């Protein structure tokens, strides 16, 4: 009689993991005035239905030795299952006794591309349903035949927790009672062609196992959302759009995995609390205004430096629990330091547990390899023309801003997104609908991203940066004016030109003078950051110090002069870790910066110079207030190529002035006359050749006085001694 309670077709389909709708047969169902309860519990020896108080309601008979049970109840209210396993007894609510979980309106918003709906719907969320505690799982996989959640709680058996498909949105959902934060899980998917895929990590996981393990982890989202922040004052003081461009920005770029390691504990990476103890005081003491982390969302391959992430919502478990990052940001803000994270929407790795062929189809990526594979990195390219993919990525950026209070998002590899033929030969790319090379879907995505992060869904004051290496127009123009809407763009052209200049032997620099001046032709066409990033000190390019020609003294002197030029030049500043003390070695992701070099006075001198440049830059409005406006700069000497001398003035709205003079030869130049834009006493604000920085201490005894001798288009001038390979800053006393 009991075998009539469980249809053989359903049994076979469930045991084979092929049932299209497990809720149609599992759980409670009313049949001819009785309640029939069916359960799939492979390995169970005995199953009974009990009340929440433990009173027996009836036995569920075994109708198939593989673990199918069924029985009838006179009671149509809540019940629990008392399950006898070979070595234990378990009492749990039935996952298939709960109705639909996700709101249809929210699912419709997700399908329409609303990033807030991703945060509302997807991922693993500890919650309470009908008075029962558990975890709600939801994942987008519209082309799968079947999706199950698997984990430690069900022995990673895809038969035990098949999910409900919410048509037509392609989202699968299931509430698993009796589990909570800390559970490890993945999804098991059967593709449309019937084959079972490798277990997939949750694209929207808020936490993960530490690599090389690859499971997702149920995060305590309630605790994260209730985190005791102490940075209200910081957040409210973040400048609005019209003011943030006038602020000093000096950014210290950090690879968190290697900045400092813990040698006494198997040389592991420092966790977030340890980084907070060490990194925040260092950044503050060095005068940087912000720390920028290379990607910290979970990434399987350490050698990618984080630029091939697979858990866009989860801080990497390499650095400890996810709430540790919240504590780091909170402490950084308390110390007056902003936090920027690198973020990668251009591509993702093809690891079997990741997004590639997620439901057996090209779901997150393009199906055509001419669009869907990146030739430089052998990675998959996001299909940004798909609403759900765009919403998924923007939701990730939004989550970093909302959940972790980050101050800025730096978007990686923007140029590769904007051009369909990026790194592709003829015949290897697909034109857009107009026959052109511009990636219109990426343009729309980037505009939507910036509008979202600058809109009401995000906390006020979030700043966006573009790593964009071409001359694409309007990267920092508003979306309303047809631009991409970024706040700042990395000035890759300035970086390449100026580094190529200082790499030249001083005797040859006269022939390349325009490399230092050309950047001012376009310096105000966008709002720029001047980046000396990790990309310039790796892959055989040499560290900044090694790029400089000459002996060790000349190399460090040239680097000091270059830093003085850079910090006076229009544009916000960014410097990669190790460069602040002139490390000789290239960046290596599995080794720390060579901190031992600070035992040498020459390297301590460079470090002290960077500290003083930062402090002076931040304290002197003439050096930052009009970074993004042509009125804040004018040349004094831009054509003295024979002597490799440059001089220019910076000013703010009130007329405050700073003049920078650079001598990029090892020849001291006494009696060098330079026009100055104001009469009187000018003090030496900065001299990169000072002895405390490792220089010769040549200079002007701290001050100069003008004469009524016109020069360089100015009514007054002064005669200076220009130190060798050095930059001077002067300001009116």
UniProtKB/Swiss-Prot annotation:
Example GO BP: glycogen biosynthetic process
UniProt keyword annotation of Transferase present: yes
GO molecular-function terms, A-Z: 1,4-alpha-glucan branching enzyme activity; cation binding; hydrolase activity, hydrolyzing O-glycosyl compounds
Associated pathway: Glycan biosynthesis; glycogen biosynthesis
SUPFAM superfamilies reported for this sequence: (Trans)glycosidases, E set domains, Glycosyl hydrolase domain
Enzyme Commission number, as recorded: 2.4.1.18
Role of this protein: Catalyzes the formation of the alpha-1,6-glucosidic linkages in glycogen by scission of a 1,4-alpha-linked oligosaccharide from growing alpha-1,4-glucan chains and the subsequent attachment of the oligosaccharide to the alpha-1,6 position.
Family: Belongs to the glycosyl hydrolase 13 family. GlgB subfamily.
Quaternary structure (record): Monomer.
Protein name, per record: 1,4-alpha-glucan branching enzyme GlgB
UniProt organism field: Burkholderia ambifaria (strain ATCC BAA-244 / DSM 16087 / CCUG 44356 / LMG 19182 / AMMD)
